[in-house]
């Protein structure tokens, strides 16, 4: 996928509260939340921008990244995919 988000994947970061929220929402055990999310994003072929945010859908996860600052805002389970599995 050739877009600005993937070109700037190394700039993606989050806040301490963001790490806590994402770990809780995705039920992650890893301490390196940002790298986990970046790796998942790189695998996605469903990336789109809507307004000021990028949305990345991969498997059961949906990631939201601010388009200007590349801050990973949140991640959560994709309820549609989860119910279809």
Task: Give the label of every model feature segment.
Residues 1-85:
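Ribonuclease/tRNase effector modules and their secretory precursors
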